[in-house]
From Swiss-Prot:
Highest taxon of source: Bacteria
Official protein name in the record: Uncharacterized HTH-type transcriptional regulator YbfP
InterPro entries from the UniProt entry: Homeodomain-like_sf, HTH_AraC, MarA-like
Designated gene of the protein: ybfP
Record's keyword annotation contains Transcription: yes
Function: Probable transcriptional regulator.
Key words, A-Z: DNA-binding, Transcription, Transcription regulation
Amino acid sequence: MYYEKAVQKTINWIESHLHEQISNEDIVNVSSFSKFHFHRIFQKEVGMSVASYIRLRRLANAAAALLYTDHRIIDIALYYQFESQEAFTRTFKKMYHMPPGAYRTFMKRFTSKKEESYMEKKMKGWVLSGSHPFQFEMGIDRENVHQGKASGYLKSTMVQDIGEFATMMQQFKADRYLGKRLRLSSFIKTKGVQHFASLWMRVDSAADDVLQFDNMSNRPITGTTNWNHYAIVLDVPENSAVISFGVQLSGPGQVWMDHVVFEEVDESVPSTNLEMPGELLDEPVNLSFEEELQK
């Protein structure tokens, strides 16, 4: 958890300085770790190097600028710290498989047609659930993207109370992960979240008993936040049947998620399981409310 906070602090700083030069000394100062130690931590937590992360985020922002602004390609390239339009084009083409100019033309046509149909189609694999799902909306966003070409979002539409919540979620069989420790991670961004937003995961038995659960209730995301990295780590007991996961929004606001990753980890990675009530007692106790007074 200590390393997670250091990584989140550094990512938050990076997100605010993508249009500026970022040196190794900057990362050292923000993270408060030595260069090589923090780079190992970052690689382990996020799954890529600091340099790769910065390059990926600059490219994602540049791709959004190509679609949603009329700025010249050279201006976008220089704003995101590429040495030249040629250098930007080479790097962009490796990620998006076409040069920036062609991407701008193709994706604007593609997006305008797609947005019309997305309002009528469900998102593949994802379902909207919760206490008041009809007061929320989920969908695909091509402008607010962490990496690649799209992110998923969940936002309130008619929420009246902070206790009303919804989740954009999936479920799958636990068979493949029985007896293992599983780490779920995602990049999340929020806007105007009045109560809380969170990543969550639950492991259930065939009898629908909750075996493992974490909804980040002890570390909620609130307010307006930039893209950052969040993770949940749970064990999958041998009697597990179903794994559920998603992003949750309680009360008014909007939350985005992108680059969701599942991976097996060893026991050196701490579990984030929230302690559930223990085993049931054989009989009721302290019915007179006086047992504590007798000690």
